[in-house]
């Protein structure tokens, strides 16, 4: 064996294990660090919001302003509930949903969250109803205006009214996630606070006479005529004064005739039927008479010329028109010939109604309830008082005549 070959193979260096020279070590120490890996561009906030919106099904916009935590809304969406599902649920079903949420996820709902969920659903229902009413009134405005003008002969005037803007409802108790949603989502679901309208200086005075009560209620007409559908400049329909007209006569100029007045009562009946249908669909209590709910519905539908003070002011005139149309027409002709104003005609409508009540046992409530068009209206307090007074006078006259007749037949001592 060659010793040189053996020594060469024994002392052969492995290049993989060889250390670099000192100069190389110094270069490695001062070499710049490698560039960081290129990260994907951050996801835009709007895209994240859209993904979050799809995940929650719109619940974040529904609940954000009512103090519901984001985790609560996420768990409700995880259970499969959407905005449309919650809007169609009753209060009992909402309670069951919240109890299931607490039991399944071991998530204790705050007291404010339980009330906030129901409040948010009620507010969304009202918003959808107002949008539907505005849509219907816009569709019916072309066809309904012509018929209304034919009856009223320019009976309505439109006056711009400056209104204050509504305050937006502040966000509450949701954490940073809600803040991100609010910063991006904006105001599709802005909740508006209703401001109470301050009455214009007409004080209420408690008096026994129902006539004075009706006059006091007339001061609220401006409040009910104010349009609540948003801020800025809106249009308010102001009623022209009534004048006495004969049957079939159209009022001239900026006046309204009595046929138009009676037509308003027929419109109230139609609005009552619509309110009843809506209440039946929701499983709520149906009104059987024209109440404040009907007047609010009429105002939202665009019929702001229908208001409680005016309709109550002339309801006994409409009752005479329904119970005895011939007598009502004769009274209208007589007052038109004499040139009397509508106030005198209104006062004169009481006497025929009292005579009708006298022929039917003085029970004016039964008379109203028995008539299909009058059953939906409350009997005016003034009319009931007049019937009671006339009944007492008739009873006193009858008793005095009986006592006088008996005294004439008594023997004289």
Curated annotation (Swiss-Prot):
Chain residue ranges for the region called Disordered: 154-177, 191-239
Intracellular or extracellular location(s): Nucleus
Tissue occurrence: Expressed in floral meristems and in indeterminate vegetative meristems.
Primary location class: nucleus
A cellular component term, taken from the record's GO annotations: nucleus
Listed GO MF terms: DNA binding
Bias (Basic and acidic residues): 201-210
GO BP annotations, alphabetical order: regulation of DNA-templated transcription
UniProt keyword terms in alphabetical order: Activator, Developmental protein, DNA-binding, Nucleus, Transcription, Transcription regulation
Residue ranges for the DNA-binding region feature of this UniProt entry: 238-242, 307-314, 378-381
Entry keyword DNA-binding: yes
Ranges annotated as biased composition (Acidic residues): 211-225
Coiled coil: none
InterPro entries according to UniProt: FLO/LFY_C, FLO_LFY, Floricaula/leafy_C_sf, LFY_SAM
Residues the UniProt record annotates as site (Interaction with DNA): 285, 292, 296, 343
Biological role: Probable transcription factor that act to specify determinacy in the progenitor cells for both flowers and leaves.
Family, per entry: Belongs to the FLO/LFY family.
The protein, known as: Floricaula/leafy homolog 1
Annotated organism of origin: Nicotiana tabacum (Common tobacco)
Organism taxonomic ancestry: Eukaryota, Viridiplantae, Streptophyta, Embryophyta, Tracheophyta
């Amino acid at each position: 064996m060659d010793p040189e070959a053996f020594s060469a193979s024994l002392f052969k260096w492995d290049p993989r294990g060889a250390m670099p020279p000192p100069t190389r070590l110094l270069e490695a120490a001062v070499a710049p660090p490698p560039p960081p890996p290129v990260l994907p561009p951050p996801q835009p906030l709007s895209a994240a919001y859209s993904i979050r919106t799809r995940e929650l099904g719109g619940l974040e916009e529904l609940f954000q302003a009512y103090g519901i935590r984001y985790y609560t809304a996420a768990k409700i969406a995880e259970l499969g509930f959407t905005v449309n599902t919650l809007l169609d649920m009753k209060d009992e079903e909402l309670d069951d949903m919240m109890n299931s949420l607490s039991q399944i996820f071991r998530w204790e709902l705050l007291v404010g969250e339980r009330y906030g969920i129901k409040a948010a659903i009620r507010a969304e229902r009202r918003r959808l109803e107002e949008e539907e009413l505005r849509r219907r009134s816009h569709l019916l405005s072309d066809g309904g205006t012509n018929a209304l003008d034919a009856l009223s002969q320019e009976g309505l005037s439109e006056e711009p009214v400056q209104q204050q803007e509504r305050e937006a409802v502040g966000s509450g108790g949701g954490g940073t996630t809600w803040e991100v949603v609010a910063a991006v989502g904006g105001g599709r679901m802005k909740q508006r606070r209703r401001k109470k309208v301050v009455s214009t200086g007409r004080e209420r005075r408690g008096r026994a006479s129902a006539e004075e009560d009706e006059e006091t209620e007339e001061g609220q007409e401006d409040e009910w005529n104010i349009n609540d559908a948003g801020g800025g400049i809106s249009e308010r329909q102001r009623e022209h004064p009534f004048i006495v007209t004969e049957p079939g006569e159209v009022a001239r100029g900026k006046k309204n005739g009595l046929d138009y007045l009676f037509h308003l009562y027929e419109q109230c009946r139609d609005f009552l039927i619509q309110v009843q249908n809506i209440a039946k669909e929701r499983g709520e209590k149906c009104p059987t008479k024209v109440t404040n709910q009907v007047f609010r519905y009429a105002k939202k539908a665009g019929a702001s010329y229908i208001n409680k003070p005016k309709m109550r002011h002339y309801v006994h005139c409409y009752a005479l028109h329904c119970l005895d149309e011939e007598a009502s027409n004769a009274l209208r002709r007589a007052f038109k010939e004499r040139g009397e104003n509508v106030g005198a005609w209104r006062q004169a409508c009481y006497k025929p109604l009292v005579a009708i009540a006298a022929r039917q046992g003085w029970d004016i409530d039964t008379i109203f309830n028995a008539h299909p068009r009058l059953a939906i209206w409350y009997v005016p307090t003034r009319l009931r008082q007049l019937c009671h007074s006339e009944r007492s006078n008739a009873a006193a006259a009858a008793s005095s005549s009986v006592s006088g007749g008996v005294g004439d037949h008594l023997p004289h001592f």
